[in-house]
Structure formats: structure tokens, C-alpha cells
Amino acid sequence: MTASKDDAGASDDHASLLEALGVDVRPDLLRLALTHRSYAYENGGLPTNERLEFLGDSVLGLSITERLYHEHPDKSEGELAKLRASVVNMHALAEVARGLGEGGLGAHLLLGKGEELTGGRDKPSILADGMESLLGAVHLQHGIDVARGVVLRLFADLLERGPRMGAGLDWKTSLQELTAERGLGVPSYEISSTGPDHDKEFTATTVIGGRAYGQGVGRSKKEAEQKAAGAAYQALTAES
């Protein structure tokens, strides 16, 4: 795929990305998978990666659900759902996306100028959507068996960590369950921000029973709160 003058922020060398995926993807299909709606709208209404994202979401969900079903025959439907939530969520997808190829998936995305200016290449929501789009593209070209193999390889670490992490990367849920078990009440989050409106950075502090347990920093309040909850979860479990 050759970059145009409007693709300046994106890498036009996708060898490392394809190597990380472990499969080849046709240039036209790969370009579609990398085309965020912001870029499409700024370039005459090109097709976006949203349909591939829709497909990839199902591929990911089926692959992870099937693996969990077979690996944990002793767990209930509710427990399996929680394990799946530790892998199939925005933050988990973004984590995997950041490890894809040189510079991560974000370096390869086609974004509009607005997203480019506001740090879109590292936004968890954009990375997660792009990850699902890539999985959709792999499925479309190679079929479900190959796509499943890609999913299970890329998400192997998260699948292994999930059973040890409660609700996993949904740290706020994990933390709330932990504090309820210990009779500590419901955690709250204090938020502060720095920087201009188009490039804000948020800091969240987790407060439990009037005591600060952990901080997190992110480009959105939600991301900062998740990180702060994770820090608090680790601190609480270390106390036990």
C-alpha cells in the first residue's frame, strides 16, 4: 500500500504489521482495515473499516469464547463471561494492538487530521476498532480457522492472565468486587486534568474508605480511572 500526501502520519511499510499478524493480507483489504472513518470523511467519503470491525468483533468473540469453554469445563456461564470480559474489551484490544509490528498498529492507521492532532494513534477506542478490523480482514481472506489461530496467538498472554485477574483488564469491576468482599465500600475516583482542550491528559486517584490507593493517567477519564483502579487492586491484594 502506497501512502499519499494525505497519509503523512501513517507508515506505508506494513511488513512488520503483517509479520506480527502471521498471515498475509491483500493490499486493498489491508488498506480498508486501516482506514478510520475520520480519514474517509476527509477524503471524499471513502469506505471505512467499520464493516470489517463488525465482522472482526464476532470472530474475536467466537474464538475466545470457544477456547474458554473448552479450557474451563468447571466454570459456570457467569464465570466464563467474566473471563471473556478480561480479553474481549477495549483496553485488552488496545494492548494487543500496541504490540503489533514496529510502532504498533497505531503507526499504520489512516486517520483524519483532527484525530491526528488529538493523539488518535494511541486512543484505546481507535486501536481496539482497528484490531477488530484486522481480524475481520484475516477472516475474510483466509477463513475462520486461520483467523481463530491468529486470535489465539495474539491473545495468548491475556488468556493466560485472565483467570488470575478477576474481571481482568476491566479493573474497575475487579476492584469493586474486591472491596465488596472485604466490606470496604464502593471505590470513588478523583479526576484532574492538564493540557489544552485538544490534548488533555487526565489523572485519576482511587479513593477507598477515605484513603487514596492508586493513581492512573490517560487521555480520557475512563482510561485514567481504569489504570487507577488497577493500581488500587494491586495495592489491596498486596496487603492481604
Swiss-Prot record:
Question: Is rRNA processing a UniProt keyword of this protein?
Answer: yes
- Compartment annotation: Cytoplasm
Q: What is the lineage of its organism?
A: Bacteria, Bacillati, Actinomycetota, Actinomycetes, Mycobacteriales
Q: Which cofactor does it need?
A: Mg(2+)
Boundaries of each RNase III domain copy?
Answer: 13-143
GO molecular function (one):
ribonuclease III activity
- Outline the subunit composition: Homodimer.
Q: Which organism is it from?
A: Nocardia farcinica (strain IFM 10152)
* Record protein name field: Ribonuclease 3
The family this protein is said to belong to: Belongs to the ribonuclease III family.
PROSITE patterns referenced in this protein's UniProt entry, alphabetically: DS_RBD, RNASE_3_1, RNASE_3_2
Keyword Ribosomal protein in annotation: no
> What SMART domains does this protein's entry cite?
DSRM, RIBOc
